[in-house]
């Protein structure tokens, strides 16, 4: 696929967007078009927007060429599912990976604009919070740099987690309204919107055409998932992958009849309820409503992402039983592990596969990254909440659990300890990590010691039963953002000593 892309890229990417005079003129035109101002009248924030759109114009050509090359090569694609992506600021990182940072800096200096000042106008994308989110962001950067076809899939949080302020020596938490000025690097893709259903009941019937069992969800509530695509630029190779984050919208966002009757709150009630799903990263789950909202968030982005990838796959392939030959679903921690039963649901209820066929596909498609050795941090959901909010998904989880425990009892007859530790459904809870391990073809830790502890202590029973699944992938960070961009003087010194190969290969 990389070779196919390079052939396309060499033809498509003699891009004049970074020729100095052309770039400067584009920035001036963007200021005029966006704000009806001259460059001298524009605020630093407005200049940031204009520069970002000029950079995006260049990225777009690569983006289109990359996706075209992937499509022509029919390349296997990884879908990296994560509750967070701690991306950091996009402008500087994109310029570094386009190998155009110095050129743009010089062009702006000729316009009496300091690129560092402009970069400071960009808020951090509030799509993540900690190491889990930064790992996801670094993986996306590396995948693009190494020419791997990949999508990141997550949620377009409106306020992130929180913005920290210090008042009288104490932390004060306020909403992080990072989208207040808009995000110049994102593209709204309304044409790929997906419906996501919650609650209701499941009715069983026989399909008169096929004679197969059919499960019908009734009396449900649904929201519309709207994708926003952000470019992930590979370093110096003209490859641009995609981070797709989902916004939530009501199916019927405004009820005019309620408004005309004076029921103003009811007129927008459904839209407000939909917005709650994407308002905040990790809402407080110390109460039932918070737990329900978190589970809604997880199913929301997973269901939308899986519907989208299945639709994309079916454009070129008629046999969904071979999905695993073209798709990998990497679950970053336990938050996305509802992907296992959701993929089963789509394959059985929508595509008409048998249980055995669907399980064969799912168990060859899904992989799981574990981030913790603490039992209390391995996500669990109350069965009453899970079954009420996701009734069909719960039925599938029950069947996965039942079939797996038959295998456990066959391998370890009479060993109740094994059953207790390895069951998905136990003590009134749905244990998401157990489900991910049972269904995934790969289970990795993120450091050698961490993985060893998983094998010998925390997940020992699973390791003894299926050792071939376990492996280690030591965490790292991208040297392009944190060294080439973060410390350019040190980066130049290193390059003077050993050349610039370290930018893409630290080995």
Q: Can you annotate each of these PLM segments?
A:
Residues 9-507:
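A conserved ligand/cofactor-binding region detector
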């Amino acid at each position: 696929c990389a070779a196919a892309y390079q052939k396309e890229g060499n033809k498509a990417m003699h891009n004049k967007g970074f020729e100095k005079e052309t770039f400067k003129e584009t920035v001036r035109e963007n200021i005029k078009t966006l704000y009806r101002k001259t460059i001298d009248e524009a605020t630093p924030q407005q200049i940031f927007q204009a520069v970002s759109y000029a950079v995006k114009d260049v990225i777009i050509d690569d983006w289109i060429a990359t996706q075209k090359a992937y499509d022509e090569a029919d390349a296997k694609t990884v879908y990296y599912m994560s509750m967070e992506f701690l991306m950091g600021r996009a402008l500087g990182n994109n310029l570094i990976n386009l190998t155009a940072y110095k050129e743009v800096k010089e062009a702006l200096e000729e316009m009496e604009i300091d690129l560092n000042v402009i970069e400071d106008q960009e808020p951090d994308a509030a799509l993540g919070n900690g190491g889990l989110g930064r790992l996801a962001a670094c993986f996306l950067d590396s995948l693009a740099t190494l020419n791997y076809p990949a999508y990141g899939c997550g949620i377009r949080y409106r306020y992130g987690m929180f913005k920290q302020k210090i008042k009288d020596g104490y932390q004060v938490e306020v909403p992080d309204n990072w989208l207040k000025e808009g995000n110049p690097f994102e593209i709204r893709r309304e044409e790929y919107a997906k419906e996501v259903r919650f609650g209701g009941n499941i009715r069983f019937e026989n399909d008169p055409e096929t004679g197969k069992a059919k499960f019908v969800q009734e009396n449900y509530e649904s929201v519309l998932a709207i994708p926003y695509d952000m470019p992930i630029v590979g370093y110096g190779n003209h490859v641009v992958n995609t981070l797709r984050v989902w916004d939530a919208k009501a199916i019927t966002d405004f009820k005019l009849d309620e408004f005309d009757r004076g029921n103003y709150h009811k007129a927008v009630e459904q839209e407000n309820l939909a917005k709650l799903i994407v308002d905040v990263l990790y809402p407080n789950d110390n109460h039932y409503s918070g737990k329900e909202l978190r589970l809604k968030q997880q199913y929301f982005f997973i269901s939308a992402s899986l519907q989208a990838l299945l639709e994309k796959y079916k454009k070129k392939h008629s046999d969904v039983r071979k999905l695993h030959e073209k798709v990998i679903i990497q679950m970053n921690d336990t938050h996305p592990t509802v992907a296992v039963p959701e993929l089963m649901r789509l394959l059985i209820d929508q595509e008409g596969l048998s249980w055995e066929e669907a399980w064969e596909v799912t168990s060859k498609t899904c992989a799981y990254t574990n981030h913790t050795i603490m039992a209390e941090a391995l996500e669990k959901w109350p069965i009453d909440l899970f079954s009420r909010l996701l009734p069909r998904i719960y039925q599938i989880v029950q069947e996965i659990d039942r079939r797996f425990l038959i295998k456990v009892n066959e391998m370890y007859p009479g060993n109740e300890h094994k059953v207790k530790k390895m069951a998905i459904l136990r003590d009134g809870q749905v244990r998401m990590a157990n489900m991910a391990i049972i269904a995934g073809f790969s289970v990795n830790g993120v450091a050698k010691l961490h993985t060893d502890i998983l094998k010998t202590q925390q997940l020992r029973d699973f390791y003894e039963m299926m050792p071939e699944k376990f492996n280690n992938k030591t965490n790292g960070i991208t040297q392009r953002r944190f060294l080439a961009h973060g410390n350019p003087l040190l980066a130049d010194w290193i390059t003077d000593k050993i050349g610039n190969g370290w930018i893409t290969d630290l080995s």
